[in-house]
């Protein structure tokens, strides 16, 4: 069984959903990002979605786009991301590690090399947000060869054909979005019709469903679980907390001015989000 299989089986037995934070690697530096990741896990995060910084993050709203920029200002590279994943994997051998990476990275490195490198570093899954499932066959094949779970996005208003394709191609979990647009709490998740979104995906008997985009409060998490999702992913709300503790102006590197304060704020937020995954 994969780490995702183990996680979802354990949570199902416990009557809980998964809470998965998105955290940008190297934001604002590798060492500080590792402390942030460790804090998230210790606060109750069930799995991780880690971002690799990119200069043109088209699927991300302003908050997460700024985290890409902070990481790049600090000198982040794909190679440094791989080293950070190795460190996280060594520290947390059982925690599923998902990656969010833009599609030019595998093209630049070569598909087979790309997936093999991330598998060897300790990643469990990779989501390429700018690669739709209809273009995913070569990525899925390279992922399978490396032992990586490919993840695809199930858009809120997708056709049945698209949802069937996403369900067939996604391994580990399915990333379902609660509304159209880019990531971020600039537009919060709408819980209207959420059960229908989840039910439409479940018809195709795919991997567990994690709901993302605009998930910023415990109520959003509770609504996702009540709608039948297996968990929720939160990115922009966490990134905002990190940004509120950063100092520095682009293009100069940033730093965390109060790591203890950041850890406290993250722990309070993540603990509340995780508590909301309890099924009633």
UniProtKB/Swiss-Prot annotation:
<comment type="function">
    <text>The alpha subunit is responsible for the aldol cleavage of indoleglycerol phosphate to indole and glyceraldehyde 3-phosphate.</text>
</comment>
<feature type="active site" description="Proton acceptor">
    <location>
        <position position="60"/>
    </location>
</feature>
<keyword id="KW-0822">Tryptophan biosynthesis</keyword>
<dbReference type="InterPro" id="IPR018204">
    <property type="entry name" value="Trp_synthase_alpha_AS"/>
</dbReference>
<dbReference type="GO" id="GO:0004834">
    <property type="term" value="F:tryptophan synthase activity"/>
</dbReference>
<keyword id="KW-0057">Aromatic amino acid biosynthesis</keyword>
<comment type="similarity">
    <text>Belongs to the TrpA family.</text>
</comment>
<dbReference type="InterPro" id="IPR013785">
    <property type="entry name" value="Aldolase_TIM"/>
</dbReference>
<comment type="subunit">
    <text>Tetramer of two alpha and two beta chains.</text>
</comment>
<dbReference type="Pfam" id="PF00290">
    <property type="entry name" value="Trp_syntA"/>
</dbReference>
<protein>
    <recommendedName>
        <fullName>Tryptophan synthase alpha chain</fullName>
        <ecNumber>4.2.1.20</ecNumber>
    </recommendedName>
</protein>
<dbReference type="GO" id="GO:0005829">
    <property type="term" value="C:cytosol"/>
</dbReference>
<keyword id="KW-0028">Amino-acid biosynthesis</keyword>
<dbReference type="InterPro" id="IPR011060">
    <property type="entry name" value="RibuloseP-bd_barrel"/>
</dbReference>
<comment type="pathway">
    <text>Amino-acid biosynthesis; L-tryptophan biosynthesis; L-tryptophan from chorismate: step 5/5.</text>
</comment>
<feature type="active site" description="Proton acceptor">
    <location>
        <position position="49"/>
    </location>
</feature>
<dbReference type="InterPro" id="IPR002028">
    <property type="entry name" value="Trp_synthase_suA"/>
</dbReference>
<keyword id="KW-0456">Lyase</keyword>
């Amino acid at each position: 069984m994969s780490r995702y299989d183990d996680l979802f089986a354990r949570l199902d037995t416990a009557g809980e959903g998964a809470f998965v934070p998105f955290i940008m690697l190297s934001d604002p530096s590798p060492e500080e990002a590792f402390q942030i990741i460790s804090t998230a896990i210790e606060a109750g995060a069930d799995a991780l979605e880690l971002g690799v910084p990119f200069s043109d993050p088209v699927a991300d709203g302003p908050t997460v786009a700024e985290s890409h920029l902070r990481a790049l200002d600090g000198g982040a590279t794909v190679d440094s991301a791989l080293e950070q994943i190795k460190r996280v994997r060594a520290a947390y051998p059982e925690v599923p590690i998902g990656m969010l990476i833009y599609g030019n990275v595998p093209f630049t490195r070569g598909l087979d090399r790309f997936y093999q490198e991330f598998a060897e570093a300790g990643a469990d899954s990779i989501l390429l947000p700018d690669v739709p499932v209809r273009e995913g066959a070569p990525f899925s094949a390279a992922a399978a060869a490396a032992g990586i779970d490919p993840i695809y996005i199930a858009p809120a208003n997708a056709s049945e054909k698209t949802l069937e394709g996403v369900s067939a191609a996604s391994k580990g979990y399915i990333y379902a979005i609660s509304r159209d647009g880019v990531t971020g709490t600039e537009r919060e998740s709408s819980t209207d019709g959420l059960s229908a979104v989840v039910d439409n995906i479940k018809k195709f008997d795919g991997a567990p469903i994690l709901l993302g985009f605009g998930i910023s409060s415990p109520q959003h998490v509770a609504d996702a679980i009540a709608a039948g999702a297996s968990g929720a992913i939160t990115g922009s709300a966490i990134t905002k907390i990190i940004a509120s503790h950063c100092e520095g102006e682009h293009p100069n590197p940033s730093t965390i001015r109060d790591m203890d304060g950041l850890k406290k704020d993250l722990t309070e937020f993540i603990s509340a989000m995780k508590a909301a995954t309890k099924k009633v």
